[in-house]
From Swiss-Prot:
F-type ATPases have 2 components, CF(1) - the catalytic core - and CF(0) - the membrane proton channel. CF(1) has five subunits: alpha(3), beta(3), gamma(1), delta(1), epsilon(1). CF(0) has three main subunits: a(1), b(2) and c(9-12). The alpha and beta chains form an alternating ring which encloses part of the gamma chain. CF(1) is attached to CF(0) by a central stalk formed by the gamma and epsilon chains, while a peripheral stalk is formed by the delta and b chains. It is an enzyme of class 7 (translocase). It catalyses: ATP + H2O + 4 H(+)(in) = ADP + phosphate + 5 H(+)(out). Its EC number is 7.1.2.2. It comes from Marinobacter nauticus (strain ATCC 700491 / DSM 11845 / VT8). InterPro entries: AAA+_ATPase, ATP-synt_VA_C, ATP_synth_F1_bsu, ATPase_a/bsu_AS, ATPase_alpha/beta_chains, ATPase_F1/V1/A1_a/bsu_N, ATPase_F1/V1/A1_a/bsu_N_sf, ATPase_F1/V1/A1_a/bsu_nucl-bd. It is a peripheral membrane protein. Pfam families: ATP-synt_ab, ATP-synt_ab_N, ATP-synt_VA_C. Belongs to the ATPase alpha/beta chains family. Produces ATP from ADP in the presence of a proton gradient across the membrane. The catalytic sites are hosted primarily by the beta subunits. The gene is atpD. Signal peptide: none annotated. It is found in: Cell inner membrane. This is ATP synthase subunit beta. GO terms for molecular function: ATP binding; ATP hydrolysis activity; proton-transporting ATP synthase activity, rotational mechanism.
């Protein structure tokens, strides 16, 4: 293949000059002398010069260094050999367990499946988390976004979903850590190891200490591995933490490439980059990819271009609220803001739909009454409104739930609640079956039986 030499280095962006008759194509991978650093061609500037992004540190590089054109895009290992392993953006093992020993490598830039090949599914994916199963049910083979500001529990919710779904789900999982904390990646690895499901998970990390090129491409590396499993006819779970960091890496790269920024300083190609990634995360007639993505919301502003661009690609959106977290209700999922395309009586059935809408109606009415309560107090409300407030406060508390992954912090064992039990419990609260129970009994419990036990214990305590 042709070779060129470095003519300019600006941070993570490197210009390489090639003979004019053998200029590399856009997205071709270039190998630098010494073989440690890979570059990816982003632009052809003319006169045989290409502008590239470094997939790794640019420390110690200098002008004149030779670069070899591989003639093809970055390719990564795919197939069952990747399971139980931690890899970087180039598919190199970083877990000190020796070579991957892959039989096949796929390019990370691929076309999305054609419209005729795609397949939709109406099957529900039970998560064991009450508020999600009731208000924003997940579809098997669908895309889910966990939206939240800093510190409201995106990663903990993601870990609980992995714990509940990946362990119950007999299929394979791919976890892409995009620009998140290395500590969380480490915790995830040992969590999977302890649960004996490590041999079903492939992990790809490009964490926040890495250059923007790595963070921009690591999501594609993870997705390529998931696509291979899907095309073999398997059902795959793809976890991405965090999609916002993918956008942010794109912003950094875009600025380094000299593009004019658009709204709020984001790259002008924001919608296109997001589309290229999201359109590939889809289920086909051969197999399915169910994707769960954490989305950081800058300054808790859901209208920010990055989360706003992500919204349109998702089947279900789980919105985490700082107000709910400040009340000590975890998971801090907002039942009035979270939505799902599956919340349709034709998909989930009349009973589930009516209970979910009933819960939302009661909570919405309580939200409207809060101003009156703040000014005039509870006594000024009608009897009907007092009943609504009482039930809403019980529902609010009953939407909380102890998590398995938080056991080490809270000391209380995690609870998995089946969908059937969730629907029956909330239907009982709406029908007034538990009006005589104190609202404290509903806080941090699994099923309704546990709340009844708590209420009994409280009564006995008062009796003494």
């Amino acid at each position: 293949m042709s070779s060129g030499h470095i003519v300019q280095i600006i941070g993570a962006v490197i210009d390489v000059e090639f003979p004019r008759d053998s200029v590399p194509s856009v997205y071709d991978a270039l190998l630098l002398e010494g073989g440690e650093t890979t570059l990816e061609v982003q632009q052809q500037l003319g006169d045989g010069i290409v502008r590239t992004i470094a997939m790794g540190s640019t420390e110690g590089l200098k002008r004149g260094l030779k670069a070899e054109n591989t003639g093809k895009p970055i390719s990564v290992p795919v197939g069952t050999q990747t399971l139980g392993r931690i890899m970087d953006v180039l598919g190199r093992p970083i877990d000190e367990q020796g070579d991957i020993g892959e039989e096949e490598r796929w390019a990370i830039h691929r076309k999305a499946p054609g419209y005729a090949d795609q397949a939709a599914s109406a099957d529900l994916l039970e998560t064991g988390i009450k508020v999600i199963d009731l208000i924003c049910p997940f579809a098997k083979g669908g895309k889910v976004g966990l939206f939240g500001g800093a510190g409201v529990g995106k990663t903990v919710n993601m870990m609980e979903l992995i714990n509940n779904i990946a362990k119950e789900h007999s299929g394979l999982s791919v976890f892409a850590g995009v620009g998140e904390r290395t500590r969380e990646g480490n915790d995830f690895y040992y969590e999977m190891k302890e649960s004996n499901v490590l041999d079903k998970v492939a992990m790809v990390y490009g964490q926040m200490n890495e250059p923007p090129g790595n963070r921009l491409r690591v999501a594609l590396t993870g997705l390529t591995m998931a696509e291979k499993f899907r095309d073999e006819g398997r059902d795959v779970l793809l976890f991405v933490d965090n999609i916002y960091r993918y956008t942010l890496a794109g912003t950094e790269v875009s600025a380094l490439l000299g593009r004019m920024p658009s709204a709020v300083g984001y790259q002008p190609t924001l919608a296109e980059e997001m589309g290229q990634l999201q359109e590939r995360i889809t289920s086909t007639k051969t197999g399915s990819i169910t994707s769960i993505q954490a989305v950081y919301v800058p300054a808790d502003d859901l209208t920010d271009p990055s989360p706003a661009t992500t919204f349109s690609h998702l089947d279900a959106t789980v919105v985490l609220s700082r107000d709910i977290a400040s009340k000590g209700i975890y998971p801090a999922i907002d039942p009035l803001d979270s939505t799902s395309r599956q919340l349709d009586p034709l998909v989930i059935g009349e009973q589930h739909y009516n209970v979910a809408r009933g819960v939302q109606n009661v909570l919405q009415r309580y939200k409207e009454l809060k101003d009156i309560i703040a000014i005039l107090g509870m006594d000024e409300l009608s009897e009907d409104d007092k009943l609504i407030v009482s039930r809403a406060r019980k529902i609010e508390r009953f939407l909380s739930q102890p998590f398995h992954v938080a056991e080490v912090f809270t000391g209380s064992p995690g609870k998995y609640v089946s969908l059937k039990e969730t629907i029956a419990s909330f239907e009982g609260i709406l029908n007034g079956d538990y009006d005589d129970m104190p609202e404290q009994a509903f806080y941090m419990c699994g099923g309704i039986e546990e709340a009844i036990e708590k209420a009994k214990a409280m009564k006995e305590k008062e009796g003494k």
